[in-house]
Amino acid sequence: MISNGTGSSFCLDSPPCRITVSVVLTVLILITIAGNVVVCLAVGLNRRLRSLTNCFIVSLAITDLLLGLLVLPFSAFYQLSCRWSFGKVFCNIYTSLDVMLCTASILNLFMISLDRYCAVTDPLRYPVLITPVRVAVSLVLIWVISITLSFLSIHLGWNSRNETSSFNHTIPKCKVQVNLVYGLVDGLVTFYLPLLVMCITYYRIFKIARDQAKRIHHMGSWKAATIGEHKATVTLAAVMGAFIICWFPYFTVFVYRGLKGDDAINEAFEAVVLWLGYANSALNPILYATLNRDFRTAYQQLFRCRPASHNAQETSLRSNSSQLARNQSREPMRQEEKPLKLQVWSGTEVTAPRGATDR
């Protein structure tokens, strides 16, 4: 999440530097918007993706899309112009939107980790644990927390040291004030506590994936075990690595500002860590959708402008012609133990022996 509504602006005096930064920020904004639009379209056009699990992914995509449309363009303009040109009223609205949307984005990531944890650790009770009502309540809770830490806190001045406005009249800057209490509460609720829980849940998920791979290895399928464990490791490392790299520097700076004061951090460094946090919204469509096999298929259908039903029928027709021959050739092997696939994380499957999961 982000507690800073805008971030400090530092002037880019060198034209080459200004051009480079402009290109980088523009590309980041376009990727954020396009990537999350594709996620929303994929779910809207593909019935197979309309599941409770993907409710959180869609919520994440909508949140990041709104961030890309309502916040990032103004952040980029402010960063490049070195002054806030939209007045005091819009400054408070802008900073509140920034805090709210970044908070909601991180809390959606947090809920995705809990959802996957329940699916992997207790798959039989998953339909009982994750119900439509509980998903709806979770989504409402995400936005209640986000609004409380953004619009409510900023407009009531709970975040300020001695003033209620984020706007500086002397120097036209728009920056959220951070006092000690707001910095600590916001940092803990929206980053450090979710980070701790996510580390625990993903470690448990990885451990289960590794145990399943070991069972396969003991049955002689060492190659499948190695591939499965490698996929689980890479996927979980990518998910947690991106989250920590993008947000940990920002929240460290944010809490430090609450402890030492708003001017305790170099403006250039503060701007870098702020945009590093924004970059997480561009990575989310890749990490939480592209790594999922069903999403990859939906992307292919979307870019080919072909409906999912057409692809399914075509695949079915192609496969039916050779199904009888394959069934006859596989008949002697059906007595052997068949593997099951456990989706450890979106797009990552580890094969496990049926006996290991039927117990």
UniProtKB/Swiss-Prot annotation:
Keywords: Cell membrane, Disulfide bond, G-protein coupled receptor, Glycoprotein, Lipoprotein, Membrane, Palmitate, Receptor, Transducer, Transmembrane, Transmembrane helix
One cellular-component annotation, GO: plasma membrane
Primary location class: membrane
Residues the UniProt record annotates as site (Implicated in histamine binding): T190
Transmembrane segments: 23-44, 58-81, 93-114, 135-159, 181-204, 235-258, 268-289
One of the GO BP terms on file: G protein-coupled receptor signaling pathway, coupled to cyclic nucleotide second messenger
Residue ranges, Cytoplasmic side: 45-57, 115-134, 205-234, 290-359
Feature: compositional bias, Polar residues: 310-327
Domain of life: Eukaryota
Basic and acidic residues bias (residue ranges): 328-340
Expression sites (tissue/organ): Gastric fundus and, to a lesser extent, in brain.
Extracellular-side positions: 1-22, 82-92, 160-180, 259-267
Family indicated by similarity: Belongs to the G-protein coupled receptor 1 family.
Described purpose of this protein according to its UniProt entry: The H2 subclass of histamine receptors mediates gastric acid secretion. The activity of this receptor is mediated by G proteins which activate adenylyl cyclase.
Protein name according to UniProt: Histamine H2 receptor
Gene: HRH2
